Amino acid sequence: MFDKKILLITGGTGSFGNAVLTRFLDTDIAEIRIFSRDEKKQDDMRKKFNNPKLKFYIGDVRDYGSVMNAMRGVDYVFHAAALKQVPSCEFHPMEAVKTNIIGTESVLEAAIVSKVARVVCLSTDKAVYPINAMGISKAMMEKVMVAKSRNLEGTETVVCGTRYGNVMASRGSVIPLFVEQLQAGKALTITDPAMTRFMMTLEDAVDLVLYAFQNGKNGDIFVQKAPAATIEVLASALLGLLQKTTHSIDVIGTRHGEKLFETLLSREEMAAAEDRGDYYRIPPDLRDLNYGKYVEQGESRISNSEDYNSHNTERLDEVGMTQLLLKLDFIQDLLAGRTAQAID
């Protein structure tokens, strides 16, 4: 897949970048470039992998010059750099705009100018029917990606995207928070017991990006079908695994910008989506601004579709949630008495 090629990962010191390195550094890939702002994380990654194929570039996706410096000679790009913490983006929405929207414009423009073969942009379920600044900025990121892709027919570059849900045990997510509270002897804090979230492992997220990389055409967005669970079921399954079933739970209400459930495909997208077994492909709307010719061609299929959300997908019970938790290195480390580290 990547034989003798150069891959650039923006925001590459996070969990996604680490997983890609683990999977591909020992293949025939020529080079993997990590582009990010945090020199400490880059140094940690350099020491962890200690591989001459791994190159590091300090920079910010907001700065086109630093992006271009890292982009020279690159064959493929995985664009993972983002501000993703919902409460932080609520209080600093313009920072989300600068990184998630303008930063994406910089990455895509640099890739096109550099004649990169394929770019995959990573998005989130919060981009669908967004109610918070992070989701709005990611929705706009997708729009930027699709708009750019319209002009790439006949060029050497293909730009597509992915959209995924909650990556379990990621930094800032609820599983590491629950564990911290347990270890401190505090009650678990649940925002709303009925709140549901899609549940994906890190390996699922990497598989989704690779599927998009191999199958995507310009403007496509890919979604992986995923199960969901209520926060109450997740908490119960975790307490059961750790033999803390009598531990107290406090219901505290939702945080800034939170939804009761998340949506991976809107009703309108589901009407046009292509079912590919484990995945959905959302094709771009390729109509131009000459809407007059579409006036008499209505789309009745939209009224017959429904969105794909964490309330209407496969729902995990406590047994199913327990089985999924056991797939996580974070949980295996806990059960083995090792220090568990949340993935970035």
Positions of the model-derived regions?
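N-terminal Rossmann NAD(P)H-binding glycine-rich loop of SDR-like oxidoreductase domains
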Residues: K5-T27
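Rossmann-fold scaffold of SDR-type NAD(P)-dependent oxidoreductases
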Residues: T10, M71-A80, C121
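Conserved glycine-rich Rossmann-like NAD(P)H-binding loop of the short-chain dehydrogenase/reductase
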Residues: D28-K41
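Conserved residues in the N-terminal Rossmann fold of short-chain dehydrogenase/reductase
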Residues: S36, I58, K98, D192, ...
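Conserved Rossmann-fold cofactor-binding substructure of NAD(P)-dependent oxidoreductases
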Residues: K55-Y76
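Hydrophobic/aromatic anchor residues within beta-strands of the central parallel beta-sheet
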Residues: F56, A96, V119, V159-T162
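Conserved Rossmann-fold NAD(P)-dependent oxidoreductase catalytic core, especially the SDR/UDP-sugar
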Residues: H79, L83-A139, K143, A147
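Strand-loop microenvironment adjacent to phosphate/nucleotide-handling motifs in alpha/beta enzyme folds
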Residues: V113, K143, A147-D344
